[in-house]
């Protein structure tokens, strides 16, 4: 059973895909007017190989890293350019590749015909998430 909205559930293709998001504890929210399944366990203080914290990375528009030093992926649920996004650890995204991606249909997201400037959108997502984290820290949450 899914606790996610109809918008998210309509894009999820299988129980296995739903379980990927649920097992990661992803929480539905909105970032920059887009529905997102957020990983609330991102550690803002984790430091990358260049000495930057995750919060500093995100402020620059870079994806945060997980405990293995790998950057998070923003996965388009349903593989449409306007799909809800899921913040997934790199290892989770790779391990569940066949569950998360329908290889029988072309993706709208990263293809040459995509009208979306994905690099810019991804960067704006992480900047907005940095602002959320700073606001929570200021509240003492």
Give, region by region, the residue ranges found by the protein language model.
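Nuclease and nuclease-like effector domains acting on nucleic acids or nucleotide cofactors
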Residues: 1-72, 78-141
């Amino acid at each position: 059973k899914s606790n996610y909205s109809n918008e998210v559930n309509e894009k999820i293709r299988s129980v296995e895909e739903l379980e990927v998001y649920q097992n990661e504890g992803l929480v539905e929210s909105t970032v920059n007017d887009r529905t997102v399944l957020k990983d609330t366990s991102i550690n803002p203080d984790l430091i990358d190989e260049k000495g930057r914290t995750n919060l500093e990375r995100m402020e620059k528009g870079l994806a945060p890293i997980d405990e293995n030093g790998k950057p998070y992926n923003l996965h388009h649920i349903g593989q449409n350019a306007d799909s809800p996004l899921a913040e997934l650890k790199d290892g989770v995204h790779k391990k569940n590749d066949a569950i998360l991606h329908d290889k029988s249909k072309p993706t709208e997201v990263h293809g040459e015909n995509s009208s979306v400037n994905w690099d810019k959108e991804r960067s704006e997502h992480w900047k907005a998430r940095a602002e959320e984290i700073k606001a929570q820290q200021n509240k003492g949450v």
